[in-house]
Amino acid sequence: MANLIVLLSPAELTGRFEEAMRAGGASVKVAPVDTLSALETVCRDRAGHFRLVAFATDVIVLAHVLAALGGPAYNLHPGPPEYPGLFPSCFAIDEGAACFGSTLHEMNERVDEGAIVGIDTFDMPAGIDRQTLDALALASAMRLVAHLAEELADIPTPLRPLPVAWSGRRRTAKDFAALCEIPPDISADDFAHRYRAVGEGPDHALTVVLHGRRFRLAPEGDAMVYVGGQAVAAAEQ
């Protein structure tokens, strides 16, 4: 069978991944899937004759699927090893990180815990907001794919782990919800800082609790919807 990379990712990002692989000089077929059932179908049909790469997906790859692959699967994390878990850009902005980037690592049953096989980093621009940082992280991730393209396309050979470990606390949905909640007496400067870190979207916004009621910040105008750092549509109001 021909070499195949199965890309578990939103459809909007397939083209970017394929471009990065070509830029890195790799010749390999890329088959996009965006659901667990579609991935399981590929596993049955190909019986391990492919490499799985996941990016910007909320699909949880179960242990029995990973075990059936015949070799390591890889996840492209949109943040550096210092920011494992959800929404790394938000926490990096909130904490004033000096640099950011992307990480390619082996997948296992626990999120962002597998061996790291590739890193791309860049300096954080001053005053950057979440949408801009997510776009830079996407570009970083595609640079990393291009750099490792030939190794990714060599399906039978696992990528060599780097002597780098994950650090920092793995952020969860609960942590992000706490970041989104602002105190009633927040200063204008602190509000602007938190807004830069969190941004706005169809599924999240800054919130505040007043007199026992929770209020949600309404977006200004038609905010764009972003998938993995790439603008895809305007949010419906």
Q: What are these model-derived regions, one by one?
A:
Residues 1-237:
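One-carbon transfer enzymes
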